Amino acid sequence: MAIKTYRPLTPTLRFQTKLVNEELTTDRPHKPLTKTKQRTGGRRNAGDITIWHRGGGHKRKLRLIDFKRDKSGVPATVATVEYDPNRSANIALLHYADGEKRYILHPVGLKVGQKVVSGPDADILVGNALPLRNIPAGTVVHNIELKPGKGAQMARSAGAQAQLVAKESDYALLKLPSGETRRVLVDCMATIGQVGNLDYENVAIGKAGRTRWMGVRPTNRGVVMNPVDHPHGGGEGKTSGGRHPVTPWGQPTRGYKTRNNKRTDKFIVTRRGKR
């Protein structure tokens, strides 16, 4: 895996970099595990915008990823490593011994031809999935469930990893990529290793058009809008907004705490630090 730079033949090539991913083995997805992705353009059924800065972009097919890893005890061989346009991580196609095929997130070090397995009796090897109760303390894991059987919700993006710090009766203590330490039930599944595609964060997009290819539309500051569009809008000439920073809907922003989920507060041992 390497970052490719370009000679500045055009102004945007001067700053643009590209990820050269030698570990990818095919450019065609396994068709039965794909699904049409319906674009919304950030709009709901009434047609009005509900999410800003979305629209356009290249057509994509959804890859159906196995986040549950619930095929217990059946060994599988890694057949391909593939690009997935819907996430920062790459994906690996598994061929199970009983003939079934599934996609999983591709961890660092997992090669084509290697065997993986999931279940409580699996070995502590990269790509294997086990309940947290069977994973030794200090192990690096990814693709972690928050509720047993629901499917993984944490540590799924490129380069993400969490560390199993300790186990206390029914709960395991995990240090998450954000820096937060959290209790998770020991019956939740996790996959051994770190998510691959580590250089993803080092890619420089280089030009506005490339962002548009990704389906992201331009962002405007509130102070350059009219008062009808944003609380910071309006004023004669250039203004600073005249008040503390707020969202378009008037909620304080830039460091203002908005978390409101007291039900799960008891599971957070250490809050994440400031970036």
Swiss-Prot record:
Q: Which UniProt keywords apply?
A: Ribonucleoprotein, Ribosomal protein, RNA-binding, rRNA-binding
Q: Name one GO molecular function term.
A: rRNA binding
Q: Which domain of life is it from?
A: Bacteria
Alphabetical GO biological process terms: cytoplasmic translation
Quote the Gene3D superfamilies the UniProt record gives: 2.30.30.30, Nucleic acid-binding proteins, Ribosomal protein L2, domain 3
Task: Write down the InterPro entries for this protein, in alphabetical order.
Answer: NA-bd_OB-fold, Rib_uL2_dom2, Ribosomal_uL2, Ribosomal_uL2_bac/org-type, Ribosomal_uL2_C, Ribosomal_uL2_CS, Ribosomal_uL2_dom3, Ribosomal_uL2_RNA-bd_dom
Region listing for Disordered, in residue ranges? 24-48, 224-264
The family line of this record is:
Belongs to the universal ribosomal protein uL2 family.
This protein is called Large ribosomal subunit protein uL2
